[in-house]
UniProtKB/Swiss-Prot annotation:
PTM notes: Ubiquitinated by AREL1.
Job description of the protein: Filament-forming cytoskeletal GTPase. Pro-apoptotic protein involved in LGR5-positive intestinal stem cell and Paneth cell expansion in the intestines, via its interaction with XIAP. May also play a role in the regulation of cell fate in the intestine. Positive regulator of apoptosis involved in hematopoietic stem cell homeostasis; via its interaction with XIAP. Negative regulator of repair and hair follicle regeneration in response to injury, due to inhibition of hair follicle stem cell proliferation, potentially via its interaction with XIAP.
Annotated stretches, region: G3 motif: 208-211
Region (G1 motif): 151-158
Region described as G4 motif: spans on this chain: 289-292
GO biological process terms on file: cell division; flagellated sperm motility; hematopoietic stem cell homeostasis; neuron migration; spermatid differentiation
Family: Belongs to the TRAFAC class TrmE-Era-EngA-EngB-Septin-like GTPase superfamily. Septin GTPase family.
GO cellular component term of the entry, any: perikaryon
Protein name in UniProt: Septin-4
Length: 478
């Protein structure tokens, strides 16, 4: 059979092609003839044999390779694997495929699902699931958050807390009369409640300070509040330094909402002293209470005045963290709006009223309705967004990394100084030969008392040295 007949679309016989190739292999061939031959030859489809075209167009079907007589029929553990083989007996080997997207566990992260990666499956390792593991463990453990509210009575602290978390923490509260409040001192009360939302549990602790600023003489009325914060730091420090550190209950105060009266022209001296006494211990968020008693221009002037006085007196309130460069633009705008809203002008209400065909929480007045969750009426929504949705974890981080670490460093320095003093006293006692040790300065002593004790210690040390010299002279004489 003539092979040239099997070359479909061929206009050049095989003998002519072979003769042309032999002729161009000679040195006498010029470039013009070579170019013409290459042009004719490149457009010819006869350069591919029909067997090659048929094999390329045939789909690759994986068939099991025929096995030799199996010597391991009785033992499945040592049976060799059966490798696939193509139809033309051309052997090849394939590595086991990685975990396919359909076989991977699903994630509750939605669009941020690290499993749904556009990369090739061969590049998938699995450490992208670490956020899911942390998320699952954190949700199972739950979260703790301690919020302190401070300010004068009657500024709506309890109402605002109930409005923020949609709870009633003060249902059993007893209001004192005027005579009972005359001799009232600042007390610290705690209200704990467990809140669950979409499977996430939050152990919320509200620390209230009834009696603050209600007396005629409010000198150092913030001391009980500062002592309470230090006590929680001390308790956590002891638990952290103990042997059993697995289940440590975190009662540290993560945020303090300080309520400022809307009446007046700015901060009062009590407000300044309170915030200056606590700004190194807790995150302070100033709140302009009862904003419905002010007109919008008055609210703006009041806010501007409070911010100026906070900067003038060197008060360090909670600072919002800077947004990363890869943050969403909407989040950046929201964060900027929160920064500009300090102090938050809020209105609290647990009463549901009807406004324009809707049932909303607000306050009903003869001239209209003030809606608590209306951004045009107050900053309640912004405060809730900052406190619960966007910056709750940052408040806890600042408490742990800044305020608690400062307290912990002070405790370690105090303990180190006491140890050094005790060693020096023991060394002096051994050298002097006396049996009565010099007492140490008790912790928590005020500076004047500590200075007096130190002077007495120096005087006693000089007396011991004189006594030691006299004893030495008497031994040498006799």
């Amino acid at each position: 059979m003539d092979r040239s007949l099997g070359w479909q679309g061929s206009s050049v016989p095989e003998d002519r092609t072979e003769a042309g190739i032999k002729r161009f292999l000679e040195d006498t061939t010029d470039d013009g003839e070579l170019s013409k031959f290459v042009k004719d030859f490149s457009g010819n489809e006869s350069c591919h044999p029909p067997e090659a075209k048929t094999w390329a167009s045939r789909p690759q079907v994986l068939e099991p390779r025929p096995q030799a007589p199996d010597l391991y029929d009785d033992d499945l553990e040592f049976r060799p694997p059966s490798w696939p083989q193509s139809a033309d007996n051309q052997q090849y080997f394939c590595a086991p495929a990685p975990l396919s997207p359909s076989a991977r566990p699903r994630s509750p992260w939605g669009k941020l699902d690290p499993y749904d990666s556009s990369e090739d499956d061969k590049e998938y390792v699995g450490f992208a699931t670490l956020p899911n593991q942390v998320h699952r463990k954190s949700v199972k453990k739950g979260f703790d958050f301690t919020l302190m509210v401070a300010g004068e009575s009657g500024l709506g602290k309890s109402t605002l807390v109930n409005s923020l978390f949609l709870t009633d923490l003060y249902r059993d509260r007893k209001l004192l009369g005027a005579e009972e409040r005359i001799m009232q001192t600042v007390e610290i009360t705690k209200h704990a409640v467990d809140i669950e939302e979409k499977g996430v549990r939050l152990r919320l602790t509200i620390v209230d300070t009834p009696g603050f600023g209600d007396a005629v003489n409010n000198t150092e009325c913030w001391k009980p509040v500062a002592e309470y914060i230090d006590q929680q730091f001390e308790q956590y420090f002891r638990d952290e330094s103990g042997l059993n550190r697995k289940n440590i209950q975190d009662n540290r105060v993560h945020c303090c909402l300080y309520f400022i009266s809307p009446f007046g022209h700015g901060l009062r001296p009590l407000d300044v002293e309170f915030m200056k006494a606590l700004h190194q211990r807790v995150n302070i968020v100033p709140i302009l209470a009862k904003a419905d008693t002010l007109t919008p221009p008055e609210v703006d002037r009041k806010k501007r005045k409070i911010r100026e006085e906070i900067e003038h007196f060197g008060i360090k309130i909670y600072q919002f963290p800077d947004c990363d460069s890869d943050e969403d633009e909407d989040f950046k705008l929201q964060d900027q709006a929160l920064k500009e809203s300090i102090p938050f002008a809020v209105i609290g209400s647990n009463t549901v009223v009807e406004a324009r065909g809707r049932r909303v929480r607000g306050r009903l007045y003869p001239w209209g309705i003030v809606e608590v969750e209306n951004p045009g009426h107050c900053d309640f929504v912004k405060l809730r967004t900052m406190l619960v949705r966007t910056h709750m974890q940052d408040l806890k981080d600042v408490t742990r990394e800044t305020h608690y670490e400062n307290y912990r460093a002070q405790c370690i320095q105090s303990m180190t100084r006491l140890v050094v003093k005790e060693r020096n006293r023991n060394k002096l006692t051994r050298e002097s030969g006396t049996d009565f040790p010099i007492p140490a300065v008790p912790p928590g002593t005020d500076p004047e008392t500590e200075k007096l004790i130190r002077e007495k210690d120096e005087e006693l040390r000089r007396m011991q040295e004189i006594l030691h010299k006299i004893q030495k002279q008497m031994k040498e004489t006799y």
